[in-house]
């Protein structure tokens, strides 16, 4: 039986989840293109804008396990619909902002809360529930690949609108694109009518507190969660600060949008590859290899002045290594703990990812405002990335994943 035949009953749900994810991730990853014109127009500092992005990441991270736990009680559809509505409101508030407060609430709090309801953890939990074990890792890679197709479209569209009509019209264009999330969330919500498949290590019926205790009793999960910090730090540093870095270096403003688009395009290939690879080799070793490889690419790029070709090659390499982490993390969590609490446990791991994102966004802006350069910021990112990747690989090779120790409610 072909892959298409296996997936046919789940195709509407998978398409809804994938399109919702590609819009939510794509628009968010492209907000950095508005950094320079927005901050100059409403007279706020670079670090103020990046503080809002940092708060977005914290809100996303700390609300992710809450959203995941609520899907067990209320179902996925209402959570995703609320998230889509919050995204639209957040972007609209940004488009009419006259100062820092509106940017903080719109780009920070509202979009952050929305991402907890529409981002990778929820989208991939929906996908994982809808397919069999045999194709699950590959399907998670496909859905993860969709996460950057939005950036492939959104970044160039936003840049063109911003250059031609101003940054407010650019963000208004994002508002229009975000409306697509509402019907997609509704369609993906059909998964609520499906019974939850069971797995060998399924935690099953228990409380959220007991599920969390079970997760953190697993040493492999703890190491994987700690290493996840570097993923958020590196990726948010790039999406938030690369446009500003290229502008400082006197490069064509369109280059940043083109590079974000290249990242999106090559992420499709990377996510598909790592989704496929995760079904064949150790997911945790592959995670460590991604962190090490990203760090090497970052060091290579920032050690020399940027060129057009070098920047696009950097975008291609980083894109390949971008969201491949998603299917590997979610697949490993399903293997360890099952499907019922996947979204919540994935959210617990994601909190650490978002602490890294806070450091990448706000820390990068603070270092730039203080030193007038991004040199120290990328050096920190490379050092921490190499350390986390090596520890992740060593632990995965020396200690196989533990069976879950079930906690009592």
Where are these regions (language model features)?
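Conserved MFS/SLC helix-loop-helix module at the cytosolic interface between two early adjacent transmembrane helices
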Residues: 62-101
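Helix-to-loop junctions at the C-terminal end of transmembrane segments
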Residues: 63-76, 271-282, 369
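C-terminal transmembrane helical hairpin of 12-TM major facilitator-type secondary transporters
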Residues: 263, 281-332
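Intracellular juxtamembrane helix-capping segments at the cytosolic ends
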Residues: 38, 117-131, 324-337
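Cytoplasmic helix-loop-helix junction between adjacent transmembrane helices
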Residues: 107-145
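Helix-loop-helix hairpin linking two adjacent transmembrane segments in secondary transporters
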Residues: 143-193
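Extracytoplasmic gate region of multi-pass secondary transporters
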Residues: 31-35, 218-271
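Hydrophobic core of transmembrane alpha-helices in multi-pass small-molecule transporters
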Residues: 102-118, 310-324
């Amino acid at each position: 039986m072909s892959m298409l035949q296996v997936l046919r009953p789940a195709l509407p749900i998978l398409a809804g989840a994938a399109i919702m994810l590609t819009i939510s991730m794509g628009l968010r990853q492209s907000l950095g293109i508005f950094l320079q014109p927005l901050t100059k127009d409403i007279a706020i500092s670079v670090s103020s804008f990046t503080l809002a992005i940092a708060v977005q990441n914290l809100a996303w991270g700390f609300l992710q396990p809450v959203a995941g736990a609520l899907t067990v009680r209320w179902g996925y559809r209402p959570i995703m619909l609320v998230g889509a509505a919050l995204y639209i409101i957040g972007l609209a508030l940004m488009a009419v902002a006259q100062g820092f407060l509106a940017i903080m609430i719109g780009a920070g709090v509202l979009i952050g809360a929305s991402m907890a309801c529409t981002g990778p953890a929820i989208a991939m939990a929906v996908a994982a529930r809808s397919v069999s074990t045999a194709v699950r890792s590959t399907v998670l890679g496909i859905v993860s690949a969709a996460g950057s197709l939005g950036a492939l479209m959104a970044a160039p569209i936003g840049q063109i609108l911003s250059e031609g009509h101003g940054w407010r019209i650019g963000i208004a264009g994002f508002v229009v694109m975000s409306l697509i999330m509402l019907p997609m969330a509704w369609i993906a919500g059909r998964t609520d009518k499906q019974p939850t498949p069971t797995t060998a290590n399924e935690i099953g019926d228990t409380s959220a507190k007991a599920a969390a205790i079970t997760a953190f009793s697993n040493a492999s999960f703890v190491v994987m969660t700690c290493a996840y910090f570097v993923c958020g730090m590196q990726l948010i540093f790039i999406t938030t600060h690369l446009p500003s870095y290229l502008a400082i270096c006197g490069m064509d403003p369109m280059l940043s949008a083109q590079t974000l688009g290249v990242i999106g395009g090559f992420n499709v290939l990377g996510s598909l590859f790592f989704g496929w690879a995760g079904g064949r080799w150790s997911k945790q070793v592959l995670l460590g290899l991604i962190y090490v490889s990203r760090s090497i690419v970052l060091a290579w790029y920032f050690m020399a002045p940027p060129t057009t070709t070098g920047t696009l090659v950097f975008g291609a390499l980083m894109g390949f290594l971008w969201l491949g982490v998603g299917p590997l993390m979610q697949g490993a969590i399903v293997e360890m703990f099952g499907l019922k609490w996947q979204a919540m446990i994935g959210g617990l791991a994601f909190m650490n990812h978002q602490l890294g994102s806070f450091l990448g966004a706000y820390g990068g802006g603070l270092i730039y405002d203080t030193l007038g350069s991004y040199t120290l910021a990328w050096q920190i990112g490379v050092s921490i990335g190499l350390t986390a990747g090596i520890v992740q690989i060593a632990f995965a090779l020396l200690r196989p994943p533990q069976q879950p120790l079930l906690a009592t409610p």
